[in-house]
Amino acid sequence: MYSDIPAGLALAFVIIGLWVLAWSADRFVGGAEAISRALGVPPFVIGMVVIGFGTSAPELAVSALSGIGGHSNLSLGNAYGSNIFNIAAILGVAALIHPIPVRPIVVFGAVPMLLAASVASCLLVCLGDGFSRMDGVWCLALFAVLLPLYCYLDGIGKCDADASSGEAASCRHPYLALFGGLALLIASSHFLVWGAVDLARALGVSELLIGLTIIAAGTSLPELASAIASARRGQHDFVLGNIIGSNFFNALAVVGTSGAISPFKDVSPHIFTRDLPIMVLLTLSIAVFGLNFRKPLSQGTIPRCCGGVWVCAFLAYLFLLIRQEALPA
């Protein structure tokens, strides 16, 4: 899937990719913000459907190609590792930049459905002998059922959507900024992943570790760049919509598409005992951290301290990964 490249060229890809990533993320979020205001669409819906699904395109491409190549652990590691990275690292960093307002419809609607999607994906992977094509079809069917419910629930909470609106958007060509920015986000993330995988291969690390760390983080760079740009603009619904939409897409559409193309076999037991439980717990933590315990039906806030907890949890998970995967089988 990835070809070996000289170390100097890999470093150039990383530097150029980082610069293009930062520039295109700002254009991408600016275009999405302008379009949502012009069409009167709630920012959370734009964040989930356009930004969340759009920035998950790298995960879909990498997992599908990994499945075709027979690399089941790389495919699942990419999808589930991206979900862990999205919450623990990206939401954590975004909350450290600015506390994130959380509407009740997110706590009681979007997050429980994301949790259901995550648990369903886990059960299909854990039960039976591997992950069959029919399991992939079930994932895609559940994705098709839950997607309209997400948008419907946000329509119920639309009345308080303006609570998290930031400064007015100014973008002369919003659609060009949106789709052009998305294309550059995806392209620049591939430059970064390409170089990172080449360096990891030289170090001789395991396929699962590459999928859970380098490729998962690399394909999540569009989400990270978009979340930071959204947080700086005060578009907090974009931040939450981005992460929830991306994780929903990864858990069902990415895993389902990859499994439907090529069934997963010889799945590492670490995915069952370590990665899936951590992904589910992190998903649940979004609702716990964002709930207003004094007034549950009022808007809550994810404070900076919770962002710090997420980042520390990700560092601990990363340490555990490196320690376990470095041990001989």
Where are these regions (language model features)?
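Hydrophobic alpha-helical segments, chiefly the membrane-spanning helices
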Residues: 1-329
